[in-house]
Regions:
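Membrane-embedded alpha-helical bundles that constitute the cytochrome b-like, heme-associated redox core
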Residues: 1-196
Length: 196
């Protein structure tokens, strides 16, 4: 299997980045729902689940940057034949997925009120503690962290977390299955090992 993308298939790196990101997004939901459904506030279990969620979010952010860099250096395989409208819908869907892959970790980091204990190995300071926050947000706009955090929390938790991510990921998965079973083309094979 080729490391780089070819005209017909995604390479190993693109596949690992795709499925790794998907797995981490799922893990991020598992940790946050575990925290809300099975732990009490101010308990060690709640804190552990929160720190795992934050750590996974930071990892997703790094992987997404790597995905974008890899995509720029290594173009995607050519699309399967289809109507112009289908091609536009696929491109719009992918741009929307990349947007949420950037926005979810970014709004999560910017809006968190605690340091991230990155997989309990080292600390990543919360944005509120950085000089950038002091200079731009407090100094530049004259707003407190609470005022800054409120819209970020809404975007991260309600808009993205509860709605948009699920809608886009479900649409992406259904489109892949439609290509596989409805159109019977190679779209799904390109991102797997070809044995579906």
């Amino acid at each position: 299997m080729a490391i780089r993308n070819t005209a017909d298939n995604y390479g190993t790196v693109a596949k690992w980045l795709h499925w790794g990101t998907a797995l981490l997004f799922l893990l991020s939901y598992v940790t946050v729902y575990y925290r809300h459904w099975f732990t009490e506030e101010q308990t060690p279990e709640n804190w552990t689940a929160l720190q795992l969620h934050l750590s996974v979010g930071v990892t997703i952010g790094v992987l997404v940057l790597l995905r974008i860099l890899w995509r720029v250096m290594n173009p995607a395989p050519r699309p399967e034949p289809g109507s112009r409208l289908a091609q536009l819908a696929a491109h719009a869907g992918h741009y929307a997925l990349y947007a949420i892959m950037i926005l979810a970790p970014l709004t999560g980091y910017l809006g968190t009120s605690v340091d991230t204990e990155y997989f309990f190995l080292f600390d990543i300071p919360k944005f509120e503690s950085t000089q950038v926050f002091a200079l731009l947000v407090t100094g530049g706009f004259g707003i407190s962290f609470e005022q800054f955090e409120r819209p970020l929390d809404f975007v991260h938790k309600q808009l993205l977390g509860e709605w948009l991510i699920w809608m886009l990921v479900t649409g992406h998965a259904l489109a892949a299955l439609y290509h596989h079973w409805g159109r019977r083309d190679r779209t799904l094979y390109k991102m797997t090992n070809g044995k579906i």
